[in-house]
């Protein structure tokens, strides 16, 4: 209303342009205001979908978790993720991924965030980051037969959240070398 009082209608062409600009601005403000209800509704639906696959504490819509997962070592930031999921077991992941897809969320798997590729940086505000840091099971080196390879090959089972130093140490104990980038061996996750 105050803007209308200040409009100069003496130049009809200019006034028409101002009118269009005001129309676009009002529409943008209404869309922005409506986005809060839409985001809240999506959060409710997503939380309900995630609830049958993981504990509620593993579903993080809070600002701290979301900002902490907005980038990797590149410090390149595009968007803040919609939600951060931190499953307790690998068995939870298929259901969480399915729930993300059904909710229209882009899925981003993330380890320790030490990468320099930007591959874990959300490019849309509707991204779900699945943090694998709690998935820490580590087996021992065992010989395995692999298709197309003669003889047995030393293998080591790890879950996605195992810190590389632990893998390197397990290989060393078994008499093998697991080559790593030592600058981040204590932070980098398999």
Predicted regions located by residue number:
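Noncatalytic alpha-helical scaffold of FAD-dependent oxidoreductases
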Residues: 1-190
């Amino acid at each position: 209303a105050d803007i209308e009082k200040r409009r100069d209608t003496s130049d009809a062409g200019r006034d028409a342009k101002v009118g269009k600009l005001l129309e676009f601005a009002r529409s943008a403000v209404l869309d922005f205001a409506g986005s809060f209800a839409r985001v809240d509704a999506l959060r409710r639906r997503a939380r309900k979908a995630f609830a049958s696959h993981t504990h509620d504490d593993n579903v993080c819509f809070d600002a701290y978790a979301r900002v902490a997962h907005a980038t990797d070592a590149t410090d390149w930031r595009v968007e803040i993720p919609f939600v951060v999921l931190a499953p307790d077991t690998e068995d939870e992941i298929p259901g969480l991924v399915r729930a993300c897809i059904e909710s229209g969320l882009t899925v981003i798997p993330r380890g320790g965030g030490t990468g320099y590729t930007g591959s874990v940086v959300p490019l849309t505000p509707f991204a779900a980051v699945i943090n694998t840091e709690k998935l820490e099971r580590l087996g021992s080196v065992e010989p395995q037969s692999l298709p197309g390879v003669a003889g047995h090959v030393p293998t080591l089972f790890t879950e996605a959240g195992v810190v590389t130093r632990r893998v390197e140490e397990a290989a060393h104990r078994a008499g093998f070398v697991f080559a790593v980038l030592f600058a981040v061996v204590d932070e980098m996750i398999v």
